[in-house]
Amino acid sequence: MKISSVIAVVVVMLGSSLGACSHSGQLGPKATPAKAAATNVQLAIEYMKLNKLADSQEFIGRALKEDPGNANVQLTAGLVYERLNDMPKAEKAYATAARLGKNDPNIQNDYAGFLCRTGKNAAGEKLFVNVARNPLYQTPEVALVNAGVCVRSTGDMLDAQRYFNRALAVRPNMPEALLQLGNVAIDAGDGADALDYVQRYLAVNPATPEVLWLGFRAQRKLGDATAAAVFARRVQSEFPNSEQAQMMRAGVDR
């Protein structure tokens, strides 16, 4: 799982955003710097979704010139520069966003994710916990799962399980928490426990290639080839273009 990232800006469709600009991409003469920056942030995000990173970089560069003191502009710059693998610029932008948006738990959550992705796990974990405790943050279970993923990446499975279970205490049957606990179990060689999490997940949540893949691995671990084949067929039929389906076609089973 990737650390969840919530950008606190309104993203408009690319066509609508382009319609607000001239052919050259310049905004109308009546646009204030803040409005111009907001539109350029939207364009940067949409181009990033299309994997047109050069265009995304151009528009976020404009936004940074127009409204550098805006936390969401800096946050989006961090995302763009991270995608470009320009980590010094990404780190500077994320840190600036966190400073400017110190009272915005969504921005703090995003910064914590960046810290964890760049090896600063202790700082990221601490920040995720603070976000989860913030009464202004409406989904503390998300921050708790993120904290669990962060510490799991360091090999600390006990703390990871603790965070995932805390997330379930806030939101019973949260799909990502169940999936993460199942993955911890299968990595520990416990097929029965992993299968239990898969069954709990599927009882109340739609299937995903990730959870079906986990079910396949759990049944293989338990030695039930017939049941494993059922999960394999579901992955191939319901999610034929998924990474998991491709791994199955390549003969990868773990």
Language-model-derived ranges and their functions:
Residues 15-37:
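Bacterial Sec signal peptide processing site at the extreme N-terminus
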